[in-house]
């Protein structure tokens, strides 16, 4: 209105539409590649001008829309550029982030709560969406035409962490009904780091340690174990993993092998391995490193029983 000193016809609220890249299948949501009611994102206005917005919470509702109790309003007719991150971090005192968008305290991935590890730590980021008072929908979507794949047109949310996924099956010489998977352990990984909610950058911190993710069940069924990790490098370009199996209710067998990682864990990539538990070893096959989609198989890796 005229009272705002800008001379427009009154502020218009920004509405949000957000997609997750279609080849991303690892979120802890109902169908893995879309949002679930209650998911919340933090939205920023990244362009200069009268329209402001800093870490504004938009929450996905049961009707399939992002809504905000305090939405961003366009204060004039200028186009604005937006970014957003997930999961939303409440900052009522404006003291959790520095001016550049870095979370001041380390983000720690807690593997003691496996059911919540994926959803709580799947850091996503989107940027470059443009909207205005005349067209107030902020589209965190892919605006490429058919046949195009221009990064500057793809404003969808993308993963910034890394993921490693193990599928455990019974192999030769194993009675699946007597083999009860207990856990999978990663040796010497870092679970703390920084995230930047304005750029999507991550930075691993802290020291390396052994981390175990409990995943239990008899190998009569396929067992899947997933780790979300900070992107990180390894001194020896490899990672030691172990698989613990309770056999016949009285014997614990621990199998150990090493996974070559010449480039470490890279952000936005999924590392997938199939573990076949045998009578005296495990074999790792179907290994792939992808953009969290489908990749080519790599060679098998043998593992020895301890």
Q: At which residue positions do the language-model features occur?
A:
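N-terminal functional modules and adjacent low-complexity/disordered segments of proteins
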Residues: 11, 15, 38, 77, ...
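Contiguous ligand/interfacial binding patches
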Residues: 181-234, 238-266
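Short, low-hydrophobicity acidic/polar segments
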Residues: 2-180, 211-227, 231, 237-242, ...
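Generic secondary-structure boundary/loop-capping signal
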Residues: 154, 158, 192, 279-281
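Surface-exposed beta-strand edges and their flanking turn/coil or helix-capping segments
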Residues: 29, 97-99, 197-200, 272-273, ...
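Exposed, polar/acidic Ser/Thr-rich sequence context and nearby capping/turn residues
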Residues: 171-172, 232-305
């Amino acid at each position: 209105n005229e009272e705002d000193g800008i001379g427009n016809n009154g502020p218009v609220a920004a509405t949000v539409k957000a997609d997750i890249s279609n080849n991303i299948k690892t979120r802890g949501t109902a169908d893995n590649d879309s949002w679930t009611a209650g998911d919340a994102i933090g939205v920023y206005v990244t362009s200069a001008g009268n329209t402001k917005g800093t870490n504004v919470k938009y929450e996905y509702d049961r009707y399939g829309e992002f809504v905000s109790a305090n939405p961003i309003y366009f204060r004039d007719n200028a186009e604005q550029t937006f970014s957003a991150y997930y999961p939303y971090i409440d900052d009522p005192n404006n003291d959790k982030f520095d001016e550049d968008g870095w979370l001041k305290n380390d983000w720690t991935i807690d593997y003691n709560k496996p059911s919540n590890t994926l959803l709580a730590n799947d850091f996503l980021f989107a940027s470059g969406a443009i909207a205005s008072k005349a067209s107030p929908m902020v589209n965190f979507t892919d605006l490429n035409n058919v046949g195009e794949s221009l990064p500057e047109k793809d404003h969808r949310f993308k993963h910034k962490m890394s993921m490693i996924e193990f599928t455990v099956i019974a192999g030769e010489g194993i009675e699946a009904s007597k083999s009860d998977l207990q856990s999978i352990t990663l040796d010497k990984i870092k679970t703390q780091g920084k995230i930047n909610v304005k750029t999507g950058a991550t930075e691993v911190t802290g020291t390396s340690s052994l981390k175990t993710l409990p995943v239990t069940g008899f190998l009569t069924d396929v067992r899947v174990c997933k780790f979300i990790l900070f992107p990180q490098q390894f001194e020896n370009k490899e990672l030691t993993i172990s698989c613990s199996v309770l056999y016949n209710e009285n014997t614990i067998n621990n199998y150990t092998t090493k996974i070559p990682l010449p480039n470490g864990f890279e952000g936005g990539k999924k590392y997938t391995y199939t573990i076949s538990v045998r009578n005296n070893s495990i074999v790792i096959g179907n290994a792939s490193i992808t953009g969290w989609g489908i990749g080519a198989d790599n060679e098998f890796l043998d593992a020895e029983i301890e």
